[in-house]
């Protein structure tokens, strides 16, 4: 980084974790809530008979420690269990017009919502309404639609299995499969791509597999911020000598070195564990090129070994017995030149072959990946090629090996498992029909992008959101905000105020709900819910804290209340299921047989793992084989534009998805600001710019992102050791540069990490 002093921009020399993490936890506690309440909450997080962290989906170990949480988990709990309240009195003091000018951090930092609220146009404020009136308004709005498919039912990955199951049941009895979901914006390429490759849209590894792997490849992921508890697992792998190979555009401290806050020796000495054996800074969007290069090396090493009289490096028996499509993949790889691979990836052939050599010489390999793989115009193809690489050497269905998509929100995978999908299969529809006695719709509905398009075009008029902040999470806020302002009705089930609540429909309603940390008392007693983590483990979660307000309702209860108000002739006994959540789980088990003995097994410490056929080398594909798949090649984004850079959006260390806990990004040296863009010093110099200059970021016309001009202005350039030709901005600020039409056509995932841009000097240069 340049020696030029820029306000709020510096360097962080410490490791991930360590005292920096503990200070951050203490700061989060002191800002949000009483220490006694906070300590009680933390001791219950991710523990048997406690509550599941409302943050990420990293699994819990079988034998938990006394404090089984991380820095960002502590922030998530502090944020939810805050002592601050957004009461009706708060809303009376602040018009929606005023609140629109607040920063997103300020909006949520006002604290927990306490009462149902409805927008009053005359005063330009949200005003308190009773639960009965709120439900009646929802029912009137839904019944007024001439077609159920004019309603959109959005789901956040924070929702429990029980809430999500009731939600999809309500929407389907109402008559639609319109289920835009937060997973559409993150790992949908996984949910679409992996079933085509191996027959299941989930990862194949368990936490125990990390104890047996011979190597880990981490691609497009930053666990230090997004899954901090994963660092403890990587630390153990590194300490036993297994190589960890990283491909990522930015250097991330959480992949470089780590001091475990649970290790007294490390905390006292400051001695960090080095994590990444080798760190390759691949160009943004260069992942397919890297994977193809690695597979070319595997083929070459296989041929060389056979020529020398060896057995080869491909797993011939596995390939012959379990797969199809290798010949076509080999032809595709042979037709791909190393010159193209090097140009697209930004890495040398020698570097790629060195990484591939580690892969070839390791018997059991795990590949972990995040949204750096999925949020591309070619995200599904990225996923296919990771599967291809693993299939070449039989690294699926083997102990210590497999594919590990690292999902974000704590139950985003579970929501999909229990029916949140716009494309229901026959098994799901038959299960609903047999258990609940109504005819569910079969026509495919809308994903997130299609939902926004339908709202924009006037084809959808009602939006109900089970959590989340859809307007801010979605690409192209200019188009998304304008679309949502056309709605007849918007209903938000939420714990805190966010910007989506301020985009006013003709009728706008906020329904406050319990958080994961809070006691849920129903007629049948205190209730627990369940969640599914990234490795298909299902376990119970029971809040332990007093609710933020006595007026709150649980998410399952709110969904059931809406259903009962809207569907006078319902076939479902909603009230019985709300009185006793065991009955919801009985319904889940009836519709989804993989939940056999659900209520019994979920009460066992640690819960249970759902059946993943690919783990047993059983492939749920049409021909019962795993598939080697090829894509469009490395030039699918169209011709390269001179002087264009490729933008990726990233999270700061002080945020989780659209929730911004604070304005710092400790591991990248940013303090008190978010208006920065990370760029390689050479890319700055080539444009006559310097570290600290104020710049404008403009899109360039492209096949993927369209020709409409888009820009963000007045950002500060931060010289950073990011891959050449790549730049990074924080999400959601960078969403303004992503066209609504810029998404992976196979999965519908917005291409938040595939945006061609140019940077130019802003008119004013004061940093």
Model-derived regions, located:
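Long, low-complexity segments enriched in small/aliphatic residues
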Residues: 576-666
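Cofactor-pocket helix-loop regions in the catalytic cores of large enzyme subunits
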Residues: 2-24, 111-410, 418, 432-610, ...
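Short Cys/His-rich Zn2+-coordinating modules
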Residues: 30-41
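Short cysteine-rich clusters marking metal-coordination/redox-active sites
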Residues: 50-56
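Glycine-rich loop/turn
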Residues: 102, 106-120, 648-676, 693
């Amino acid at each position: 980084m340049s020696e030029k002093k820029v306000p709020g921009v510096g360097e962080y020399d410490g490791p991930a974790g360590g005292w920096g993490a503990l200070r951050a936890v203490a700061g989060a506690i002191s800002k949000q809530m009483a220490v006694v309440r906070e300590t009680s909450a933390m001791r219950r997080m991710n523990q048997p008979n406690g509550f599941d962290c409302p943050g990420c989906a990293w699994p819990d170990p079988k034998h938990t420690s006394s404090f089984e949480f991380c820095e960002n988990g502590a922030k998530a709990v502090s944020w939810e269990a805050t002592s601050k309240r957004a009461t009706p009195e708060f809303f009376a003091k602040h018009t929606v017009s005023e609140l629109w000018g607040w920063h997103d951090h300020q909006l949520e930092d006002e604290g927990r919502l306490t009462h149902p609220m409805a927008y009053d146009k005359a005063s330009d404020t949200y005003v308190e309404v009773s639960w009965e009136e709120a439900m009646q308004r929802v029912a009137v709005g839904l019944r007024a639609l001439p077609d159920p498919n004019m309603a959109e039912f959005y789901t956040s990955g924070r929702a429990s299995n029980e809430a999500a199951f009731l939600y999809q049941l309500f929407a389907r009895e109402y008559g639609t499969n319109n289920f835009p979901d937060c997973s559409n914006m993150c790992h949908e390429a996984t949910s679409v791509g992996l079933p085509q490759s191996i027959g299941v849209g989930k990862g194949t590894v368990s936490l125990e597999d990390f104890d047996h792997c011979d190597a880990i490849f981490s691609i497009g992921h930053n666990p230090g911020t997004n899954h901090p508890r994963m660092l403890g697992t990587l630390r153990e792998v590194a300490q036993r000598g297994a190589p960890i190979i990283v491909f990522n555009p930015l250097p991330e401290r959480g992949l470089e070195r780590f001091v475990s806050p649970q290790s007294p020796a490390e905390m006292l000495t400051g001695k960090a564990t080095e994590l990444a054996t080798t760190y390759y800074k691949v160009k943004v969007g260069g992942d397919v090129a890297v994977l193809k290069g690695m597979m070319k090396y595997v083929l070459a090493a296989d041929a060389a070994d056979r020529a020398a009289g060896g057995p080869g490096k491909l797993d011939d028996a596995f390939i012959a017995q379990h797969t199809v499509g290798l010949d076509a993949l080999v032809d595709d790889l042979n037709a791909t030149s190393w010159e193209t691979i090097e140009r697209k990836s930004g890495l040398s052939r020698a570097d790629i072959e060195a990484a591939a050599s580690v892969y070839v010489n390791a018997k059991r390999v795990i590949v972990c990946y995040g949204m750096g793989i999925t949020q591309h115009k070619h995200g599904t193809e990225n996923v296919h090629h990771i599967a291809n690489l693993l299939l070449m050497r039989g690294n699926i269905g083997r102990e210590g090996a497999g594919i590990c998509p690292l999902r974000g929100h704590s139950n985003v995978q579970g929501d999909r498992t229990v029916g949140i999908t716009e494309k229901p299969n026959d098994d799901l529809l038959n299960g609903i029909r047999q258990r609940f006695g109504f005819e569910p719709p079969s026509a495919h509905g809308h994903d997130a992008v299609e939902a926004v398009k339908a709202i924009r075009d006037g084809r959808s008029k009602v939006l109900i959101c089970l959590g989340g902040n859809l307007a801010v999470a979605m690409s192209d806020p200019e188009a998304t905000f304008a679309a949502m302002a056309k709605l007849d009705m918007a209903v938000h089930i939420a714990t805190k105020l966010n910007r989506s609540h301020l985009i006013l429909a003709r009728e706008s309603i906020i329904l406050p709900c319990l958080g994961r940390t809070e006691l849920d008392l129903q007629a049948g007693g205190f209730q627990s819910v369940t969640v599914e983590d990234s490795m298909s483990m299902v376990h119970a979660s029971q809040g332990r804290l007093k609710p933020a307000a006595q007026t709150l309702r649980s998410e399952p209860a709110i969904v059931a209340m809406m259903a009962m108000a809207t569907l006078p002739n319902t076939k479902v006994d909603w009230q019985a299921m709300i009185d006793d959540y065991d009955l919801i789980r009985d319904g889940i088990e009836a519709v989804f047989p993989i939940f056999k003995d659900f209520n019994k097994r979920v009460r066992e410490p640690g819960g249970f793992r759902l059946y993943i056929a690919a783990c047993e080398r059983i492939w749920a594909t049409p021909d019962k084989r795993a598939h080697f798949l090829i894509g469009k090649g490395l030039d699918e984004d169209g011709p390269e534009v001179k002087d264009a850079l490729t933008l990726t959006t990233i999270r700061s260390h002080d945020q989780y998805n659209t929730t911004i806990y604070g304005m710092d990004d400790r591991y990248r040296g940013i303090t008190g600001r978010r208006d920065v863009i990370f760029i390689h010093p050479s890319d700055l110099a080539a444009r006559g710019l310097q570290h600290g200059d104020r710049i404008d970021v403009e899109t360039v016309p492209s096949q993927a992102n369209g020709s409409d001009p888009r820009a963000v202005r007045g950002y500060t350039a931060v010289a950073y050791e990011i891959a050449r030709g790549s730049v990074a901005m924080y999400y959601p600020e960078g969403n303004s540069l992503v066209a609504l039409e810029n998404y992976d056509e196979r999965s519908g995932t917005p291409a938040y990490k595939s945006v061609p841009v140019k940077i130019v000097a802003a008119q004013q240069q004061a940093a």
